[in-house]
Amino acid sequence: YGKTESDVTFAAFHPQLGRFVTDHLELYGEGTLLLYRDPRLAVAGGIAGIGGRYHFWNDRGWTPYVIGIAGLIWTGLDIPELDRTFNFQLVHGVGVRVVPPRGPGWIVELRNHHISNAGTAGENLGVNAATVVAGVQWVLR
């Protein structure tokens, strides 16, 4: 923090698959596809293979939740903060899920998406991106 200098702009696609293990806790994984526009065109792809989403309510049509997930990511982005092609990703944040009685629902999340080499090379400055994620979801019962 304080040493990073790159402004990074990207669009993301995060397909997710999860399973509720309790009434409130969902374990899930997600794919990551990032299309960078700034500072130059680049692509990143990876998998966040283990994560959790804790839903505060389970008796309403909507619920706030907290998330945390970790995984691996490959990136072609050439910036000082990422001195490796193969990196790690950590995501944490808060969100709201709306689940209608039938049909698709939606989610909105505010996340911190951290990408770094986890101290395996160089200075390990990493990239922290405050991101807003909105999506459509289906709950299979």
Question: What feature does the model see in each segment?
Answer:
Residues 1-3, 36-39, 77-82, 118-124:
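Extracellular loop and loop/strand-boundary signature of outer-membrane beta-barrel proteins
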Residues 7-13, 42-48, 62, 84-90, ...:
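Residues that define the transmembrane beta-barrel architecture of outer-membrane proteins
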Residues 11-78, 100, 137:
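Gram-negative (and chloroplast) outer-membrane scaffold detector with strong preference
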Residues 81, 103-107:
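Short conserved catalytic/interaction loops centered on acidic-Pro-aromatic/His motifs
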Residues 93:
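Specific aromatic-rich, kink-prone transmembrane helix
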Residues 98-100, 126-141:
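Outer-membrane beta-barrel "beta-signal"
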Residues 109-111:
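Transmembrane alpha-helical segments of integral membrane proteins
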Residues 114:
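Histidine-centered active-site/metal-ligand motif
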